[in-house]
Amino acid sequence: VHLTADEKAAVTALWGKVNVDEVGGEALGRLLVVYPWTQRFFDSFGDLSSPDAVMGNPKVKAHGKKVLNSFSDGLKNLDNLKGTFAKLSELHCDKLHVDPENFKLLGNVLVCVLAHHFGKEFTPQVQAAYQKVVAGVANALAHKYH
């Protein structure tokens, strides 16, 4: 991912304020609600029968936190996203058979959640930088599919 120094600074500054537990659960939950076909990958999570059930599901929240912790690792290695996400790409491709389009969907949902949480602080410039990052992460996660 090519980010300018200003974009990297903006991404890093905002990410330092992110509550990974809260934002991770909300982002994954919203993905499962807005794109219900993604729920098929989470059969073991229990009740996903309604938006309230999804958003209150502790397994969704826990996995969302795990996802954002991995995303945090990516932010520390923006110049080597493919290397950073190689094992996760392999897992999601070979074992879980996740449609790589879902990575893009989750990235876009994450951007929406960040905008919701940070309001005016999430300027168009910050959003543009985050869109580059989530696209790069989605591409890295889809790498083993190519």
From Swiss-Prot:
The modification Phosphoserine is found at residue 44. The modification N6-acetyllysine is found at residues 59, 82, 144. SUPFAM superfamilies: Globin-like (SSF46458). Red blood cells. Residues 2-146 form the Globin domain. Involved in oxygen transport from the lung to the various peripheral tissues. This is Hemoglobin subunit beta. It comes from Odobenus rosmarus divergens (Pacific walrus).
